[in-house]
């Protein structure tokens, strides 16, 4: 009888451990989805400002540390130089996202890199990469590239 109880106890503990591992993995997957969804929404909102050439508002949505290093006028000139050659956005689709704690030239933190496939009037197939940093509970754009 003791052997049966011991076996059942071991089986229950093993099952609980498996459930805890599954729950932990499931919870991490859900956290990843939530993080990615929030970062993607922030990137899409920021891109809509850039699409409308509202560079002043896009600049205001960057982290303070970046605004301290670049004036609004510098940012606007830079964005005009990057985006004007491509023309108007015709379509944009999400490709994927990647999370990291390290970003070259930036302090360690929470970064999400979002990649989009974009069609412009002057370039039918381009890629846009938006890197965001989680700061004070918000996703803020720290880098933008269009290829």
Predicted regions and their residues:
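Positively charged n-region of N-terminal signal peptides that target proteins for export
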Residues: 1-4
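Short charge-dense sequence patches
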Residues: 24-33, 77-84, 127-128
């Amino acid at each position: 009888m003791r052997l049966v109880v011991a076996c059942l106890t071991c089986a229950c503990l093993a099952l609980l451990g498996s459930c805890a591992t599954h729950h932990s993995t499931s919870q991490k997957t859900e956290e990843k989805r939530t993080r990615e969804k929030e970062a993607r929404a922030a990137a899409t909102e920021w891109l809509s400002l850039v699409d409308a050439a509202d560079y002043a508002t896009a600049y205001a949505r960057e982290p303070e540390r970046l605004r301290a290093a670049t004036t609004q006028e510098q940012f606007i000139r830079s964005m005009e130089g990057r985006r004007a050659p491509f023309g108007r956005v015709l379509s944009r689709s999400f490709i994927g996202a990647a999370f990291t704690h390290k970003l070259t030239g930036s302090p360690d933190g929470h970064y999400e890199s979002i990649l989009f496939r974009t069609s412009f009037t002057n370039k039918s197939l381009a890629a846009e990469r938006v890197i965001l940093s989680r700061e004070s509970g918000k996703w803020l754009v720290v880098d933008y590239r269009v290829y």
